[in-house]
Amino acid sequence: MESTMSPYFGIVVSLAAFGIGTFLFKKTKGFFLFTPLFVAMVLGIAFLKIGGFSYADYNNGGEIIKFFLEPATIAFAIPLYKQRDKLKKYWWQIMASIIAGSICSVTIVYLLAKGIHLDSAVMKSMLPQAATTAIALPLSKGIGGISDITAFAVIFNAVIVYALGALFLKVFKVKNPISKGLALGTSGHALGVAVGIEMGEVEAAMASIAVVVVGVVTVLVIPVFVQLIGG
């Protein structure tokens, strides 16, 4: 059923929830459960449920926000352009690392889903989680997945990387800025880039190229796994 609610409703709810998440994240000095995106998601769902609003009421404005996903993804080219000298110098190492990481990500998700006997539709929904939302959602729909599950998987994956990515890099003593950026972008897409930006220009650029390449590799590799699932 279509909603007559103003698009501003969904936009205001999203911005307010994200603002609260940002405030809590800063106040708790980066406690991972208060990652802004995760808090915004929980608060948004709670607000709609308690207020008796439908998803259609929210999505009038949500679609406007969603429109900016593609331009935001393209904007990753800006930090990459600034570090094009490093891309030229280490291009094959960079590409090999991203491709290997992408394939490993999809393979691990497939094996885990297979191991716990998930339904085929759910498995297909989980496979694109390594790609950014702008790529993962249409890809999931195209292979017979469930977009809502894919969206949750992508966001959950990104939240984990945003909250704990820097910590994991320290634990595994990753010090090279190129390696840091590639790891963040390959595992955490857009929010991985956000962490990279906080670290430096090189990390941001490498994370950006990782997001783009992971998207391409995911699109090429997933049909193989869909055949294994039986689809």
UniProtKB/Swiss-Prot annotation:
Do you know which InterPro entries this protein is assigned to? Antiholin-like_LrgB (IPR024891), CidB/LrgB (IPR007300)
What are the annotated GO cellular component locations?
A: plasma membrane
Print the keywords alphabetically. Cell membrane, Cytolysis, Membrane, Transmembrane, Transmembrane helix
Pfam assignment, any one: LrgB
The residues that cross the membrane are 7-24, 34-56, 91-113, 149-171, 207-229
Task: Give GO BP annotations, semicolon-separated.
Answer: cytolysis; killing of cells of another organism; programmed cell death
- Membrane topology (UniProt): Multi-pass membrane protein
- Which compartment or compartments is the protein found in? Cell membrane
- Family of this protein: Belongs to the CidB/LrgB family. LrgB subfamily.
The UniProt function text for this chain reads: Inhibits the expression or activity of extracellular murein hydrolases by interacting, possibly with LrgA, with the holin-like protein CidA. The LrgAB and CidA proteins may affect the proton motive force of the membrane. May be involved in programmed cell death (PCD), possibly triggering PCD in response to antibiotics and environmental stresses.
State what protein this is by name. Answer: Antiholin-like protein LrgB
Record organism:
Bacillus subtilis (strain 168)
Species classification: Bacteria, Bacillati, Bacillota, Bacilli, Bacillales
